[in-house]
């Protein structure tokens, strides 16, 4: 079970000088068990809480990069300036939205992520004025029947172009060798 999503486009950056407060904002999430969807639920047991797909104690994650990578943002890394740049996401949803909302005040203005769900639903995260907005959207496909072609005709056209290129190249080489 679960709902799979992937980022179609992502450009989210946390500036170097804001990494520490952003990481602290993530650690502060740990104090509110009501936000956590993961946990253990045995009768007569002490109930344990954690965020989906995350360790129970977020402080075991060493820094913001570790947090975001554990959340599922692959290839999250530092750029040459030392800013943290989020990588792509392609997995089940967990609670990424809460973590990114928590660090929104520290995310570079104008950052965004465009998401596509397994049911072809689109939405966008936009970061402005220290907030993350979730914006639903839809994609429309436009077909161009007047530009239609057959695969075989396209293959032949490509072969003709390659033959013409080869002939031109052979002529040029012959001229160069006679010079």
Language-model segments: residues:
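Charged interaction segments
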Residues: 50-179
């Amino acid at each position: 079970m679960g709902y799979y999503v992937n980022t179609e486009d992502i450009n989210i950056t946390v500036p170097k000088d804001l990494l520490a407060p952003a990481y602290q904002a993530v650690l502060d999430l740990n104090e509110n068990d009501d936000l956590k969807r993961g946990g253990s639920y045995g009768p007569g047991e002490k109930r344990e809480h954690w965020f989906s797909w995350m360790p129970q104690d977020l402080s075991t994650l060493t820094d913001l990069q570790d947090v975001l990578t554990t959340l599922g943002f692959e290839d999250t890394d530092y750029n040459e300036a030392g800013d943290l740049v989020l990588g792509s996401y392609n997995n089940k949803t967990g609670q990424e939205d809460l973590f990114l909302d928590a660090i929104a005040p520290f995310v570079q203005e104008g950052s965004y992520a465009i998401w596509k769900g397994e049911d072809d639903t689109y939405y966008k995260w936009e970061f402005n004025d220290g907030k993350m907005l979730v914006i639903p959207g839809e994609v429309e496909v436009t077909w161009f029947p007047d530009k239609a072609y057959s695969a075989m005709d396209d293959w032949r056209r490509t072969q003709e172009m390659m033959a013409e290129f080869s002939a031109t190249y052979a002529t040029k080489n012959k001229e160069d060798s006679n010079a």
